[in-house]
């Protein structure tokens, strides 16, 4: 039994169908035990009997195996099915007992394999869950991703290919080499089969095909120009003349003369005609037309169907010239002075001048030969009547008449600014540029704005610039294109081969000079990242100084120390050398940077130019490809398909490639790092992507893309091209606007709420004013030398609108004099000269703080809480009834204390913004009131008044205070304000006092400039507002002992030294006795935000 099985296997492997059939039929036991789906094992690459039968195209055995439950979907070690092996042909060679190659394959083998393939395609296997039967996998792929159609196409088996395609084989399947079945046939030189597959692929049916082709048919393919042939020019001229004549009710000759005088512009003619028709005709060399006769719809235009047209019109001339027979005998020619024969056809001129026919012919021939065909006037002296065209045609010969028509068309084109001749030598075509109408729809192609130098085509493929008549260079204008060509001439790019490498070398050299120093011995670059000035070269072991680059042995105590260098001359020389080298390296780097930038644009410019030259050949091959596809499809389906889409796609590709080529010179001259350039480059990249996609689909020996996909790609490229040109015509993007002044907000919403502002905009306005004020801090000289800007708005204009109501939200008050008085009295009491000297470091650190930092503002607020400011008993009781601030957006809990009715909720403490506004007001007052110098400050009476607010350290009242209070931040700030602006603190008026512009403060000397327009406004929600309102005044501020002291101080300043002593006696222990001793006392009085 084993010998029979072995013999049968060998017969299958060798392809001996007769021996295999004989063994199989003569051994019933083999027939019963043989399973066609059983693998022969690894030595035979796991092929089954069905694989070998399909490989050699054994019809009888293959049919038998399929009838005995053979499964053609079984796979071998290469993941190949029986259909793969059937379509392979004799090219595959398998060693050692596997498939042996056959040197020759007869033609009958193709038909036999086609029969085997048909049997496999008709095979039905087990019933599946969906009620269908298992079928042979026609698109099964092996390890190399080849389908049976790939192998059939590579083998050139046309019958098998047709069967596979008919049963739905995938024409677009790609193997691991990205080859389709058409590509496989092409590589094996089966050209007819490849062409057949190409036609099947291109004209394959798809659900999207009809929709895309409908869009392609509806696509507006018009361009903003029109190529005109000579007959088109003649028809355009005649149509324009006829329409104008019909509109003006004038003869054709008159209409032509009017149009010629107005540059063939109908709108221009109508404007002149409506203003003065007689003057318009006179300047054009024609007479004013009369109304047409009855039976005619216009002068010499279309005849009426009811009235026959006569050979000669009796109304040719406005002046009806009637000559008697006696006069005809005596008429003379005005040129030759000979009698005009009666037998000659008369030449009737509208002006009435008579000349013989011979003189007319000689005169007209001379004018036509001179090229003045469009302005031939009457030969009479001082007559400017134009000779009608019908007279010229009736007098001159046919050959001369032909030349006249040529000159006439030439004059029509040259006098029409909307038409230009094609500059290509030997081309007789012209181009008409379509004018863009303002009433065109936005979706119309012609509604796109025209470029300054559009590219036009005469219809023969001759592209040229409309403006300069040179090479087409849109989107560049003529001057930009000229500059680009000049740049190429100057740069000589053929000599700039290694620009990129040189640019990198220059950049490296600049970096080394900027970040390193050369060794003084071996000149190797050394970078210092840590350590002292004693350097040792790692290459030559040379010890040198990093500062002066000289030998380290020269350094000792004479140079400032062993690890310091104070050798000024040497250091100066080294720095000059380093600076010169750096400047030279920067120049070199900048030059190579410019060269590298030019090479970037020039390289891409040349790449697109080279691609354009290669793709121009597709115009010739596209026509051949169209004929081949039509012929191949006609043989298979019998129809003649539309193949013009290939040529259209090539034209779209060439137009876009040319625009991309010229877009790089346009981008080269754009402003670097501008919004306009960024938008341009984005659109340019987008256009390049769709263009390359279309090029891959079209620029192939065999098309492998369906027709509808090629059409879709071409439509997309055309759309992107039009959008790109329209964008460039509009200027790509508006000019970059200047950057507006930035007003930064705080990090989160809680910042401006926590700091007491009603909105982020109010906080931004505050920050802006803080940045633009005078920021010099220091002594009195620096304050007095920086007066405020007269154009800068005052605090009142910034905080209070014109209507008089505050812009702040409820619960946020402007600083009042009363509250500031309490604050000053409690803070400045703690300041003494001794304490100021002890806290000098704190004051220096404070002078460098940034007031705009929210963290600093928060620290000031917290310092208020810890400072324990003094308040009188009445004020403390009033503040204890403070309402909750949680309702205004703070993160603090609401107060549970009861709030007295009919009482406004005061603010417990100053917000950070109010504290900083206080500092601004103090500085502004100090700058405006500058009556003193630092020398006279101590001797002025104001210094005596200062002692009321700032008692000395020897004062017994101040000696008994807690020294820890002097360490708080707020006390230091107030002390600093006091030292810098001593006069400003004394000048703060009470809330109930308005300072007029004419009044002068007591601390100002005679002749000095007074403080003008100083008014402190108290809002309705002030913290010390009294319930009683007197008639004629606003809300009154609760009296305060410190206010009385200030008023007393003012009166004392006016009265003299005695008043100052009275003011000193007026201050006193009342304020100091109100000061809380601990922070807890202050927390009980004030609810701090």
Swiss-Prot record:
Residues involved in Zn(2+) 3 binding: 465, 468, 473, 478
Ranges annotated as IBR-type zinc finger: 401-478
ANK repeat intervals: 45-74, 144-173
Phosphoserine: residues carrying this PTM: 737, 884, 911
GO-annotated biological processes: protein ubiquitination; ubiquitin-dependent protein catabolic process
Task performed by this protein: Might act as an E3 ubiquitin-protein ligase, or as part of E3 complex, which accepts ubiquitin from specific E2 ubiquitin-conjugating enzymes and then transfers it to substrates.
Residue runs in coiled coils: 575-640
Lipidation (N-myristoyl glycine): 2
Spans annotated as Disordered: 281-321, 776-821, 889-912, 927-964, 1026-1089
One cellular-component annotation, GO: ubiquitin ligase complex
Protein name: Ankyrin repeat and IBR domain-containing protein 1
Residues the entry annotates as binding Zn(2+) 1: 333, 336, 356, 359
Keywords: ANK repeat, Coiled coil, Lipoprotein, Metal-binding, Myristate, Phosphoprotein, Repeat, Transferase, Ubl conjugation pathway, Zinc, Zinc-finger
């Amino acid at each position: 039994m084993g010998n029979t099985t072995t013999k049968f296997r060998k017969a299958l492997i060798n392809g001996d169908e007769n021996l295999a059939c004989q063994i199989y039929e003569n051994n019933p036991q083999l027939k019963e035990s043989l399973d066609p789906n059983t693998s022969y094992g690894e030595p035979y690459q796991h092929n089954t009997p069905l694989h070998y039968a399909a490989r050699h195209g054994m019809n009888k055995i293959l049919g038998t195996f399929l009838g005995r439950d053979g499964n053609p979907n079984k796979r071998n070690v290469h993941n190949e099915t029986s259909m793969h092996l059937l379509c392979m042909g004799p090219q595959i060679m398998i060693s050692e007992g596997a498939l042996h190659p056959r040197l020759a394959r007869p033609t009958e083998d193709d038909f036999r394999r086609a029969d085997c393939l048909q049997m496999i395609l008709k095979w039905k296997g087990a019933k599946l869950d969906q009620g269908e039967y298992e079928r042979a996998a026609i698109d099964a792929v092996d390890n190399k991703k080849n389908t049976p159609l790939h192998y059939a196409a590579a083998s050139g088996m046309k019958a098998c290919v047709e069967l596979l395609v008919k049963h739905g084989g995938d024409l677009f399947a790609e193997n691991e080499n990205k080859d389709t079945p058409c590509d496989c046939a092409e590589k094996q030189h089966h050209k007819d089969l490849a062409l057949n597959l190409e036609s099947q692929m291109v004209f394959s049916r798809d659900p999207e095909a009809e929709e895309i082709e409908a869009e392609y048919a509806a696509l507006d393919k018009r361009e903003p120009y029109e190529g005109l042939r000579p007959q088109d020019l003649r028809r355009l001229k005649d149509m324009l003349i006829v329409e104008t004549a019909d509109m003006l009710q004038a003869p054709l000759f008159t209409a032509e003369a009017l149009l010629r005088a107005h540059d063939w512009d109908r709108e221009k003619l109508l404007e002149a005609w409506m203003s003065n028709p007689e003057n318009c005709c006179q300047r054009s060399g024609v007479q004013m037309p009369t109304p047409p006769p009855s039976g005619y719809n216009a002068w010499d235009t279309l005849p009426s169907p009811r009235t026959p047209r006569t050979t000669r019109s009796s109304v040719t001339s406005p002046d009806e010239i009637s000559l008697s027979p006696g006069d005809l005998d005596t008429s003379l020619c005005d040129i030759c002075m000979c009698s005009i024969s009666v037998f000659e056809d008369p030449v009737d001129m509208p002006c009435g001048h008579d000349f013989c026919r011979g003189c007319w012919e000689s005169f007209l021939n001379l004018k036509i030969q001179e090229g003045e065909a469009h302005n031939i006037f009457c030969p009479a002296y001082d007559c400017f009547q134009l000779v009608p065209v019908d007279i010229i045609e009736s007098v001159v010969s046919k050959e001369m008449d032909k030349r006249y028509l040529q000159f006439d068309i030439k004059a029509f084109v040259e006098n029409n600014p909307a038409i230009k001749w094609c500059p290509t030598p030997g081309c007789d075509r012209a181009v008409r540029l379509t004018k863009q109408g303002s009433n065109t729809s936005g979706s119309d192609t012609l509604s796109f704005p025209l470029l300054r130098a559009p590219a036009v085509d005469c219809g023969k493929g001759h592209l040229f610039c409309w403006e300069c008549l040179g090479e087409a260079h849109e989107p560049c204008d003529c001057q930009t294109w000229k500059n680009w060509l000049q740049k190429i001439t100057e740069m000589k790019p053929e000599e700039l081969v290694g620009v990129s490498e040189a640019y990198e070398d220059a950049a490296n050299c600049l970096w080394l000079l900027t970040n390193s120093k050369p060794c003084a011995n071996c000149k190797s670059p050394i970078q210092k990242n840590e350590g002292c000035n004693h350097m040792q070269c790692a290459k030559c072991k040379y010890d040198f100084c990093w500062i002066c680059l000289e030998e380290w042995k020269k350094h000792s105590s004479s140079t400032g120390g062993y690890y310091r260098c104070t050798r000024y001359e040497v250091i100066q020389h080294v720095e000059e050398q380093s600076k010169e080298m750096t400047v030279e390296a920067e120049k070199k780097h900048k030059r190579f940077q410019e060269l590298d930038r030019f090479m970037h644009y020039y390289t891409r410019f040349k790449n697109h130019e080279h691609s354009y030259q290669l793709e121009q050949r597709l115009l010739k091959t596209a026509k051949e490809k169209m004929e081949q596809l039509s012929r191949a499809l006609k043989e298979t389906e019998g129809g003649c398909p539309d193949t013009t889409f290939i040529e259209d796609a090539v034209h779209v590709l060439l137009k876009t490639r040319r625009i991309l080529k010229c877009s790089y010179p346009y981008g080269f001259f754009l402003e670097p790092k501008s919004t306009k350039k960024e938008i341009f480059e984005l659109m340019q990249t987008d256009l390049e992507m769709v263009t390359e996609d279309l090029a891959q689909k079209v620029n192939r020996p065999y098309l492998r893309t369906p027709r509808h996909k090629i059409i879709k790609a071409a439509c997309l490229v055309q759309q992107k091209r039009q959008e790109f040109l329209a964008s460039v015509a509009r200027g790509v993007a508006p000019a970059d606007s200047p950057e507006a002044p930035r007003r930064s907000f705080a990090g989160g919403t809680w910042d401006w709420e926590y700091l007491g502002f009603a909105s982020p905009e109010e906080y931004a306005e505050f920050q802006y004013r803080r940045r633009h004020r005078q920021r010099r801090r220091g002594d009195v000289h620096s304050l007095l030398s920086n007066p405020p800007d007269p154009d800068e708005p005052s605090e009142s204009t910034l905080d209070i609108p014109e209507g008089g109501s505050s812009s702040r939200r409820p619960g946020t008050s402007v600083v009042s004099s009363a509250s500031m008085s309490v604050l000053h009295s409690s803070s400045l009491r703690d300041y003494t000269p001794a304490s100021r000297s002890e806290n000098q470091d704190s004051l220096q650190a404070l002078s460098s703080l940034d007031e705009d930092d929210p963290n600093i503002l928060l620290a000031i607020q917290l310092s208020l809480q810890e400072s324990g400011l003094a308040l009188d008993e009445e004020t403390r009781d009033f503040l204890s009834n403070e309402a909750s601030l949680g309702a205004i957006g703070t993160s603090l809990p609401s107060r549970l204390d009861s709030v007295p009715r009919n009482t406004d909720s005061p603010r417990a403490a100053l917000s950070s913004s109010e504290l900083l506004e206080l500092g601004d007001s103090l500085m502004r007052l100090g700058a405006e009131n500058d009556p003193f110098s630092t020398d006279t400050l101590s001797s002025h009476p104001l210094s005596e008044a200062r002692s009321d607010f700032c008692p000395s350290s020897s004062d017994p009242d101040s000696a008994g205070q807690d020294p820890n209070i002097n360490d708080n931040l707020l006390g230091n700030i107030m002390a600093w304000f006091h030292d810098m602006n001593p006069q400003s603190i004394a000048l703060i008026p009470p809330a109930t006092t308005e300072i007029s512009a004419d009044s002068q403060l007591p601390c100002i000397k005679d002749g000095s400039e007074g403080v003008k327009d100083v008014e402190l406004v108290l809002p309705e929600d002030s913290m010390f507002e009294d319930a009683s309102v007197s008639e004629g005044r606003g809300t009154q501020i609760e009296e305060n002992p410190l206010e009385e002291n200030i008023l007393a101080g003012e009166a004392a300043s006016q009265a003299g030294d005695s008043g100052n002593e009275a003011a000193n006696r007026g201050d006193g222990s009342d304020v100091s006795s109100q000061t809380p001793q601990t922070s807890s006392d202050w927390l009980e009085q004030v609810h701090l935000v």
